[in-house]
């Protein structure tokens, strides 16, 4: 199951890359942002801003550090290395792709949060995906693996949707 999710993720990234300069995709992007802008509420604004805060790099480093401390106490050094290299590799790849594609962010009229740098790919979504994939890989044989899988997928999908909702990224 984890390999299927990785395949789906790679397929999604490939489709996104191919569609970056497609006028139909760009029209869809603008229409989606306008639709979300028209359906904002204070309640949803609060949820999405909260997700944006806990999905950034500082929070990701804190979560992974606490996880690694717990693993260190039980002498699971291989998993600590796996988590560390996954976070480092995913972040490096994401920032390289941002530099390579250098896609502009949506117009500031849609933004509910301050952003900087390129839009594609979303660093928040990369961090959420790396964390979700780590959790899925490490706990795939756990008694509650299906619930863990569902929550991990909900986390990275929610992060991606929240970044679009906040006007920080195109869909």
Whereabouts are the PLM-identified features?
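N-terminal transmembrane-helix/juxtamembrane module of multi-pass inner/ER membrane proteins
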Residues: 1-59, 99-112
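Interfacial segments of alpha-helical transmembrane regions
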Residues: 3-8, 64-92
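Membrane-embedded catalytic cores of phosphoryl/pyrophosphoryl-handling enzymes
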Residues: 4-5, 111-171
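Aromatic-anchored segments of alpha-helical transmembrane domains
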Residues: 12-16, 88-95, 154-167
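Membrane-helix interface segments
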Residues: 43-44, 75-80, 107, 142-148
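Hydrophobic alpha-helical transmembrane segments
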Residues: 53-72, 129-132
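Hydrophobic alpha-helical transmembrane segments of integral membrane proteins
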Residues: 81-110, 170-171
């Amino acid at each position: 199951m984890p390999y299927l999710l990785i395949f789906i993720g790679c397929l999604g990234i490939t489709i996104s890359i191919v569609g970056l300069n497609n006028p139909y995709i760009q029209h869809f992007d603008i229409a989606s942002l306008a639709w979300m802008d028209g359906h904002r509420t204070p309640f949803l604004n609060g949820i999405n801003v909260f997700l944006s805060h806990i999905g950034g790099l500082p929070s990701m480093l804190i979560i992974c550090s606490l996880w690694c401390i717990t693993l260190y106490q039980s002498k699971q050094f291989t998993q600590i290395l796996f988590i560390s290299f996954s976070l480092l590799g995913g972040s490096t790849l994401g920032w390289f792709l941002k530099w390579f594609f250098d896609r502009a962010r949506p117009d500031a009229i849609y933004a509910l949060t301050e952003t900087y740098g390129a839009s594609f790919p979303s660093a928040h979504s990369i961090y959420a995906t790396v964390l979700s994939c780590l959790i899925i890989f490490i706990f795939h044989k756990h008694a509650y693996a299906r619930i863990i899988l569902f929550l991990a997928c909900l986390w990275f999908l929610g992060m991606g949707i929240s970044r679009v909702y906040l006007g920080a990224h195109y869909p």
